[in-house]
Amino acid sequence: MRFRYFLVKKDWRSTMVQNSCWQSKSHKVKAFTLLESLLALIVISGGLLLFQAMSQLLISEVRYQQQSEQKEWLLFVDQLEVELDRSQFEKVEGNRLYMKQDGKDIAIGKSKSDDFRKTNARGRGYQPMVYGLKSVRITEDNQLVRFHFQFQKGLEREFIYRVEKEKS
C-alpha cells in the first residue's frame, strides 16, 4: 500500500496528517457507545448479584440440612431411649438387640434396607425408627449396649445404654 505525499514546501507534515484524518473519517471505527457500555455493566452487575444470591441460598440450604440431620438424630435417640427404658434386656445377637416389652419378645436392629426397625423376635412387624443408614453395629459388654451408626451421608454416631440383666 503506497501513500501519496503532497509535497508542499511549507509544511508537508500537516498535509499528510490531514490526509490520514480524512481517510479515517471515511471508514467507520467499530467501538462501544456509552449506552452500550452502561448496558453491559448493568448486565454484568446483575449476573454477579444473581450468583451471590444463589450462593447464599445454597449455603443456607446446607446449614438447614445439617440442622435437620441433627434434629432427626436427637428424635431417634429419644425414641430409642423410651423403647429401651420400657423393656427388659435379653441379649445381643446377630447385630440385633433382643428384649421383652409388655410380655412380648421384641428385636431392634438394621433391616436389609437402609432403616433401623423395631420388630418382633422373628423379624416380623414393621416400625422404622430412622432411615438412611449405611451400617449399624450393636455390641454388649459389661451391661453396656453400644449402638454404632453410620449414615449414608457420612454422619457417624454412637449411642451407649446401660442395661440391667434379670437375675434368675
Curated annotation (Swiss-Prot):
One Gene Ontology cellular component: pilus
Purpose: Required for formation of the type IV-like pilus (T4P) that plays a role in transformation. Transformation pili are dynamically extended and retracted, perhaps thereby promoting DNA uptake and transformation. Involved in transformation. Required for DNA binding.
Transmembrane annotation, as ranges: 31-51
This protein's UniProt keywords: Cell membrane, Competence, Fimbrium, Membrane, Transmembrane, Transmembrane helix
Disulfide bonds: none
Keyword Transmembrane carried by entry: yes
Species classification: Bacteria, Bacillati, Bacillota, Bacilli, Lactobacillales
InterPro entries: Competence_ComGF (IPR016977)
Gene name in the database record: comGF
Record's keyword annotation contains Ribonucleoprotein: no
Protein name stated in the entry: Competence protein ComGF
Topology class, membrane: Single-pass membrane protein
Localization per Swiss-Prot or TrEMBL: Cell membrane; Fimbrium
A single GO BP: establishment of competence for transformation
Originating species: Streptococcus pneumoniae (strain ATCC BAA-255 / R6)
Subunit structure of this chain's protein: The transformation pili are flexible filaments, consisting mainly of the major pilin ComGC and smaller amounts of the minor pilins, including at least ComGD, ComGF and ComGG, and perhaps ComGE. Interacts with ComGD. Interacts with ComGE. Interacts with ComGG.
